[in-house]
Amino acid sequence: MKPKISFNNVVMRYGGFLALDRLNLDIADGEFVTVVGPSGCGKSTAMNIAAGLLQPSGGEILVGDKPVTGPGPERGVIFQQYALFPWLTVRQNVEFGLSVAGMSRVKRREISDHYLSLVGLTDFADALPKALSGGMKQRCAIARAYAAAPEILLMDEPFGALDALTRVHMQDQLLDAWSRERRTVMFITHDVDEAVYLANRVIVMAARPGRLDQIIPVDLPYPRTEAIRLSPEFAAIRNRVWHAVYHQQPQTDQQSSHGQ
């Protein structure tokens, strides 16, 4: 089976700074992959290249068998910032891309109803973003991305600004939506527990210049539950990922973490 996303010797330079050094990675159709690594290792840069928001200095990235040359409707992007239009209601935000595409009002309503229900925002369809909590705003952003029917979701620390309990709830909401439709997901995070809880595979990137260090499979069943999160199997994978990330930190950062 051909991969859905392929990074082939991807290099990214900013002037004299090498951000990515020959990154090679394949992500399968319908797979949920999380990407972790020390700060500055190029996680977000890799995602932005996949989104078509940056052009690599070398190598190529393929979606299916087509080179990525810019943004495309087959890729939806969700950032840590909610990026909602504050003057539009929740429903209007979800329907925005559909409206731009010329879809009929009846069809837009059908699609927005479905995804608002999926993320638990039906009762807030007519509310403005200012009336929503942080978690609700991000659920709206997820519904908007899903409504546009992308084949791939690229998510850059989408839950990073949320409190711990809301973050766990959002992880479950996202997995519920993913399990129903099996879009391909590339999810960037600094949270090791989050990375393991969500993913089929955890991609660990090496310290700068960014490159693939190792791929850690997550052999845990879906649906993921609190019992799985508390299981010895989860703890073992979580510890393996944590040690992989920790040993990628620059030596000075490791010393700081020990108070030296």
Swiss-Prot record:
CDD domains in the record: ABC_NrtD_SsuB_transporters
Annotated keywords: ATP-binding, Cell inner membrane, Cell membrane, Membrane, Nucleotide-binding, Translocase, Transport
Binding site for ATP: G37, P38, S39, G40, C41, G42, K43, S44
Matches recorded under Gene3D superfamilies: P-loop containing nucleotide triphosphate hydrolases
Protein family membership: Belongs to the ABC transporter superfamily.
Subunit composition and interactions: The complex is composed of two ATP-binding proteins (BAB2_1147), two transmembrane proteins (BAB2_1148) and a solute-binding protein (BAB2_1146).
Protein name: Putative ATP-binding protein BAB2_1147
Organism per entry: Brucella abortus (strain 2308)
